[in-house]
A protein has these predicted regions:
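Hinge/cleft segment of the Venus flytrap/periplasmic-binding protein
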Residues: 24-26, 158, 166, 276-337
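Flexible loop/hinge segments that line or gate small-molecule binding clefts
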Residues: 93-131, 256-265
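Hydrophobic alpha-helical segments within soluble ligand-binding/sensing domains
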Residues: 71, 125-153, 169, 200-201, ...
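Short beta-strand elements in bilobed, periplasmic/extracellular small-molecule ligand-binding domains
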Residues: 53-64, 154-157, 175-197
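Hydrophobic alpha-helical
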Residues: 76-79, 85-105, 174, 192-262
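Extracytoplasmic "Venus flytrap"
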Residues: 26-46, 50-54, 59-77, 81-83, ...
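Short, solvent-exposed amphipathic alpha-helices that sit
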Residues: 39-53, 132-139, 165-185, 203, ...
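Short beta-strand elements at the ligand-binding edges of bilobed clamshell
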Residues: 63, 117-142, 157-159, 190, ...
Length: 337
């Protein structure tokens, strides 16, 4: 009898402990295309810190290693590793669909970063690249017309002409920005530089040989800009004189410490770059997941919900170098002066 009473007391004490046990933290898979990239390192680090502080959630990096197949395989690991949610960065959307749909059926919250994921309808977090691309195009056109009012504008872009989001976020709005200043500007179009900086270098060499009149260049990623500027230098171009263009004006994407040296060099023709902020991006990707969890955003819809987050126009003319240094130090944790 005493044993039965003792057992009853023990059980009575245990039940409230079980009932009031702390809930398990939400586990979030945070996909990046390449964790060796400083932007992706910084946005993951911020997402991890932000999710823990604001939501008590745990964030885990899923590195795509710049390999489309690895990115797709990582989707299977979302289920295998018991994740509650995932924010995806995928290159092959069609290949990813089966894994995404399987995860959705298991009640896992799925979102995408940069591009809507095929017709899955999962919400997408995107950077507002179009606004900054337009601004850079307009500013470059104004500066060229100021320096050379009688020289017609001839522009070219190097990037990903067949990538929907790059076209809508970078190429097209840049062209519109230029045309808003000079409706008669000539556009040579977007050249396919998807194979990297070496191919980009040859493309630019060919362009300036065949069209020496080209004077506005949008190099649509910082790695491509390495090839762009190398080509211009080899061709005897890429020059400014104390802040005034001599041969052309170049803008880029993915502003970083390396690009800052050229942007604020009064004798380099690289004068603007789109700053993609890892802090706002990392936080935005987490907030989108939590908005789905709270019911503010539907898990799927047609068309997919798209949330846009701020980008920055880092410009020799409109952003003082001290502000650019502060931006880099804040966003990337550098200690520049």
């Amino acid at each position: 009898m005493k044993k039965a009473v003792l057992l009853f007391i023990v059980l009575a004490l245990l039940v409230p402990m079980v009932a009031f046990a702390a809930p398990q933290p939400l586990k979030i898979a945070f996909f990046v295309s390449d964790l060796s990239n400083v932007f992706h390192q910084a946005q993951f680090a911020e997402a991890q810190k932000y999710a823990k502080a604001k939501y008590g959630a745990e964030v885990f990096a899923f590195d795509g290693k710049s390999d489309s197949a690895v990115m797709t395989q990582n989707i299977d690991q979302v289920v295998a590793q018991g994740m509650d949610a995932a924010t995806l960065h995928i290159w092959d959307q069609e290949a990813a669909k089966p894994g995404v749909n399987a995860a959705l059926k298991k009640g896992i919250i799925m979102t995408s970063f940069f591009s809507p994921l095929a017709d899955t309808g999962i919400p997408t977090a995107r950077s507002d690249e179009a606004g900054t691309s337009f601004a850079m195009g307009a500013e470059m056109a104004k500066q060229w017309k100021k320096a050379f009012p009688n020289k017609p504008i001839v522009m070219v872009q190097v990037g990903w002409p067949n990538h929907t989001e790059v076209k809508s976020g970078r190429t097209d709005p840049f062209v519109k920005g230029v045309l808003s200043v000079d409706p008669k500007a000539t556009n040579l179009g977007c050249q396919d530089s998807s194979k990297g900086p070496d191919v980009t270098k040859q493309i630019i060499l060919d362009v300036v040989t065949q069209h020496p009149e080209v004077n506005l260049i949008y190099s649509e990623a910082s790695n491509l800009t390495v090839g762009t500027m190398a080509a211009l230098t080899q061709a005897g171009r890429g020059k400014f004189a104390n802040g005034k263009p001599l041969t052309e004006i170049v803008c880029s994407v993915d502003f970083d410490e390396v690009e800052m040296k050229s942007v604020y060099d009064p004798n380099s023709s690289l004068k603007l770059s789109m700053g993609l902020p890892p802090l706002e991006t990392g936080r935005g990707r987490i907030d989108l997941i939590m908005d789905i969890k709270s019911g503010k955003v539907k898990p799927t819809s047609q068309p997919a919900v798209e949330k846009f987050y701020k980008t920055y126009n880092i410009s020799y003319w409109t952003m003082p170098r001290a502000d650019a240094v502060k931006w880099l130090n804040t966003q990337f944790g550098t200690s520049l002066k």
